[in-house]
Amino acid sequence: MDIQNIRAFLMVAETQSFSRAAEKLFLTQPAISKRIATLEDSLDCQLFDRLGKNIQLTQAGQALIPSYQRILSEINETRRIISTLRSEVSGHLKFGTSHHIGLHRLPPILKKYTKLYHQVELDIQFMDSEQAAALILKGSIELALITLPDEIENHLSTIPVWTDTMFCVVAKDHVLAKQKYVTIKQLSEHGVLLQAQSTHTRDIIDQALKLNPEIKIIMESNYLETIKAMIQNGLGWGVLPESMIDGSLHRLNIKGVKMERHLGVLLHASRTLSSSANALLETLKNSN
């Protein structure tokens, strides 16, 4: 049922004139007449009696007025609600984040976000990048803040937010810390603590360093904080983002090696985001 036809019917009923109804709706009289005729055809009944220059509602027309007024009122209320949702940021926001972003990038963002949008209830889940993609496709979470892959699945899209430069590091008293420059061959002679296989960060490391398959891997972990703690205690060397390298670690100089990863937002390309999710994206955008 066409809402414009209902509006035309109610205006003709109110003014008892096709010409006056046309003026009020900024239409031509033939356009008003066509809308009424279309409505009558769809209902298979006559709504107005044409009595010369005068018109009069039929019994069917009179019966329809309360229903059509209620329909228009409900439509206007629905539009008001949608407009309010667009202007007011509230509700429930469920999203995922990697442990690294959740610990090192997200806290100042959330501090600003919760101050601006205190009515939003946050549900933050820590997860791997691969798990986040599956949950977004399933619709379980709206978005995720993760290490962005070079290639993404169909129906997903990404928004880069941060660039993480990564370096090989050792403890201050590690034998490699005494070297001005270190080669890949020298790295391969020492035990290493690496990110877990099949993670995007591990793929970047493997492509950049092309390590000997026989290298001694002391430990693999998804948690960079765990890897950092092990390196600090002299268990081996590893790769960490610049933001995690402090005075307890020594950065190794390796000629020709550059490692970068991109952190940002992963979301469903076809999903309409809530006002709270859009507000988070805006906060992230303004954070850089």
Annotated model-derived regions:
Residues 90-153, 215, 220-223:
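Central regulatory/effector-binding core of bacterial HTH transcription factors
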Residues 253-288:
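A late-sequence structural motif
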Residues 128-141, 147, 200-252:
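Hydrophobic hinge/microswitch elements
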Residues 116, 127-190, 242-248, 258-259:
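Acidic, Gly/Pro-rich loop/turn segments at junctions of secondary structure
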